[in-house]
Amino acid sequence: LNVSFLGVYSACASFISSIIILANSISGKLIKEGLAFTSSHNLCSEKQFRFPVEYGALKPIYSTFTCTGSVGCNVSKYPSRIKVISSTIGSVVDYGIKDANNMGAVMAPSAVDTLIKHLEYTNTKVNDYDLILTGDLGLYGADLFKMILKKDYGINIRNYIDSGSIIYNKEQEKYSGGSGPVCLPLVLFNNILNNKRYKKIIVIGTGSLHCPTLVNQKKSIPSTSHLISLEVE
């Protein structure tokens, strides 16, 4: 295809990174529109970052199950009912977690850090939004996200959903929930944006910046989270 291509990788925050790049390129009049894609596959992720499924390694209850799927969207200068209003690129945060199965604990601190920075930059409060949506913290990571907000910043968040926590139903028994770059956009486009209750939405992509070498060396796992603010007509 004779179309400009840019490969983006921010772990499970990659899709939000793509949206930020496209939206800012359009705002700067560099392009008129662009396509953002992301995908993930359970077996590939397990083999690359943890253990092959055939190995039969046991997983702790706080681990997550990588989603298999693919999502694409068009970001354009032309008007539509969904608008990207603002964005915040997150910093790298490291809380010293070394367990590659405990991605929720790895990513929750960076999600909080990015959210707080965005609220400060935009002079807004959590209650100014209808929903705060995170990517793939899972059940335990989502609880940690809320706990840090309350303990460190005095914010008792109620308008909050984690994509990984709701993408699977209880009968599927997928540990702490879903994960992977595609987890957030699957929930965002198939569920959240079709719900007319949500007009102003903060979407936080959460990414764990680890690799097998880092884990095998018993190094701590850093993370980063990127954020976009959407308005839906």
Set out the residue ranges of the language-model regions.
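Claisen-condensing/thiolase-fold acyl-transfer catalytic domains that form or cleave C-C bonds
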Residues: 1-31, 40, 45-47, 78, ...
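Condensing-enzyme catalytic core mediating Claisen C-C bond formation in acyl metabolism
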Residues: 52-117, 121-124, 155-166, 198-206, ...
